[in-house]
């Protein structure tokens, strides 16, 4: 099958892990370039060792590479601030963009929830690591019954949080909360991230709370289980930490939530852990692994749709 050439902008943890995933194999994507800004970057050195074109001159360096005219998709694994400049340049050159930063210029995309991408879409946003891990669960509850409120808490090892992640904390919470509503289907969303300094490092753990009307608990339990299996198809280390828990609140004992008010109905609690595949990053970095796995899936879907359109 014909493949679409792609580039990765950002040679840090996320960019390098994505590089390894793409080089391990893809039916629709061929990695043609890796871009950084540090000539001594380990990610750039690994790319060169594997025969991939590199530049340490950022987006302008990418545009000067001989392979650039043939590149159809660029993955941006830098920062929300830098992405705005990168997107403008890439759009001007007719490239498709998969945004792994919280910039959220384009529509959100979560593989097991998002469907066919509109042919006019030029930029898709991968939300955040916490969003990729938790939004599928919110969506799993939403397909059973309307979710009035959803709150997620993502706890990740501080070792897995590089400078890009730390610089984007505010964007993380805003973007994730917004995507919980838009993609997950919640009436209102809230997101919290915790950088866990524990040693040895803990794997990613996520807690998802949803508030709904009183419904069949077995239906929610089955929907969550099915969604977990769907995510495991591309993130094998994604799993339930324990059984789904339920708590009912009546008018005589409503649940009080700051900033939301009183709630009467069913509270569903889902506890997850995400272990990384260990492609480049340590297995405790499941937060980064789910992001790169989802980005690869998004890029492959974009490439497949464009290649099919050209062949038609």
From Swiss-Prot:
Q: List the disulfide bonds.
A: none
Identify its protein family.
Belongs to the acetaldehyde dehydrogenase family.
Instruction: Write down the Gene3D superfamilies for this protein, in alphabetical order.
Output: Dihydrodipicolinate Reductase, domain 2 (3.30.360.10), NAD(P)-binding Rossmann-like Domain (3.40.50.720)
- SUPFAM superfamilies reported for this sequence: Glyceraldehyde-3-phosphate dehydrogenase-like, C-terminal domain (SSF55347), NAD(P)-binding Rossmann-fold domains (SSF51735)
Q: Where is the active site?
A: 129 (acyl-thioester intermediate)
Q: Which organism is it from?
A: Sphingobium yanoikuyae (Sphingomonas yanoikuyae)
Name the top EC class: oxidoreductase
Keyword NAD in the entry? The reply is: yes
Where does the chain bind NAD(+)? 11-14, 160-168, 287
Protein name, per record: Acetaldehyde dehydrogenase
User: Which EC number(s) are documented for this chain?
Assistant: 1.2.1.10
Biological processes per GO annotation: catabolic process
Keyword terms of this UniProt record:
Aromatic hydrocarbons catabolism, NAD, Oxidoreductase
Q: Which HAMAP family match?
A: Ac_ald_DH_ac
InterPro entries from the UniProt entry: Acetaldehyde_dehydrogenase, Acetylaldehyde_DH_C, Gfo/Idh/MocA-like_OxRdtase_N, NAD(P)-bd_dom_sf, Semialdehyde_DH_NAD-bd
Question: Listed GO molecular functions?
Answer: acetaldehyde dehydrogenase (acetylating) activity; NAD binding
UniProt catalytic activity: acetaldehyde + NAD(+) + CoA = acetyl-CoA + NADH + H(+)
Transmembrane ranges, per UniProt, are none
